[in-house]
């Protein structure tokens, strides 16, 4: 009988750390280096295959978490990347830029608070000036702050910050970037399981993620005749600095997932790469659910 080489299979249940995690508390926006366990962005594992060769990408919130993993994956697939961060995230952004350049691609880190329309417009102008245009727009930056004490604990200041960061910024950036995006370009938004199964302590955040789903569906139909696709990724629990910085108890984070653990940022990036690539040429208006088994519509 012919011999067959045994395929190497990876058990997703035990692939990455599982809760309980050590107690940890950070001030917003949190630090990757201070997390235990440290998030995996694919530094040692992601291998590119030229799927995005020569593409020009603009990614918001690229300093850490999912954003860093996406920037790394895009670069290793051949894209040049402009990404945003807040002033207090400069050290994190420097590491993301290093990973992009290590892949042999252009990295431009831009301080930008997307709650302000003028900064969004300036960001797009900066990206076009640095890269010559925009082929990929990833609206990933977001803000959340858990309020287990109910709606009364959500201040107008917090509500406004969540809305401006998660919705207004996405709207302004998409509107400005489209003037520089050719046929074949792609918009990818970061939605969330919270948009479908909202947690009571993330009321305002969940509202915005549900809105992102509707925005993506409408935008895809609007842009189809221009040859530009629009999709979103809806992650489940992902181990990023936002968790110890915004959640009251991160020790059990992700245990409710059918896989029994949170995702690592590196596990989200391939979905963005696929949607950005020509392999998804007939896919638009879709929400790719990456929840570890939690069923969504």
Which residues does each predicted region cover?
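Conserved glycine-rich Rossmann-like NAD(P)H-binding loop of the short-chain dehydrogenase/reductase
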Residues: 79-95
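Conserved mid-core segment of classical short-chain dehydrogenase/reductases
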Residues: 14, 116, 121, 142-160, ...
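A glycine/serine/threonine-rich, flexible loop-to-helix segment
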Residues: 153, 201-203, 225, 232-258, ...
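Catalytic Tyr-X3-Lys loop
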Residues: 152-171, 184, 188, 212, ...
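Alpha-helical segment proximal to the catalytic Tyr-Lys
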Residues: 179-180, 221-225, 281
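Residue(s) in the substrate-gating loop at a strand-loop-helix junction
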Residues: 192
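Short C-terminal tail/terminal secondary-structure segment
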Residues: 3-8, 35, 43-44, 148, ...
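Active-site helix of classical SDR
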Residues: 174, 208, 216
């Amino acid at each position: 009988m012919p011999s067959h080489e045994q395929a190497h299979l990876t058990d997703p249940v035990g692939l990455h750390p599982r809760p309980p995690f050590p107690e940890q508390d950070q001030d917003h926006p949190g630090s990757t280096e201070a997390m235990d366990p440290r998030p995996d962005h694919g530094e040692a594992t992601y291998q590119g295959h030229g799927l995005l060769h020569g593409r020009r990408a603009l990614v918001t919130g690229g300093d850490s978490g999912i954003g860093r993993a996406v920037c790394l994956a895009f670069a290793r697939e051949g894209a040049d990347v402009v990404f945003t961060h807040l002033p207090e995230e400069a050290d994190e952004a420097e590491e993301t830029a290093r990973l992009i350049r290590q892949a042999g691609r252009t990295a431009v880190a831009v301080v930008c608070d997307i709650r302000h329309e003028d900064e969004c417009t300036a960001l797009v102008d900066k990206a076009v000036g640095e890269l010559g245009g925009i082929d990929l727009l990833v609206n990933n930056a977001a803000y959340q702050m858990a309020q287990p004490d109910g709606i009364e604990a959500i201040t107008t200041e917090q509500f406004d910050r969540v809305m401006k960061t998660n919705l207004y910024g996405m709207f302004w950036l998409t509107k400005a970037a489209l003037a520089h995006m050719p046929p074949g370009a792609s918009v990818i938004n970061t939605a969330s399981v919270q948009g479908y199964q909202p947690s009571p302590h993330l009321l305002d955040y969940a509202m915005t993620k549900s809105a992102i789903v509707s925005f993506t569906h409408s935008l895809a139909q609007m842009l189809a005749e221009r040859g530009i696709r629009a999709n979103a990724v809806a992650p489940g629990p992902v181990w990023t600095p936002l968790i110890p910085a915004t959640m009251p108890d991160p020790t059990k984070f992700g245990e409710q997932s059918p896989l029994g653990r949170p995702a690592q940022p590196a596990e989200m990036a391939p979905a963005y790469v696929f949607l950005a690539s020509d392999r998804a040429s007939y896919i638009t208006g879709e929400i790719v659910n990456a929840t570890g088994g939690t069923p969504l519509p």
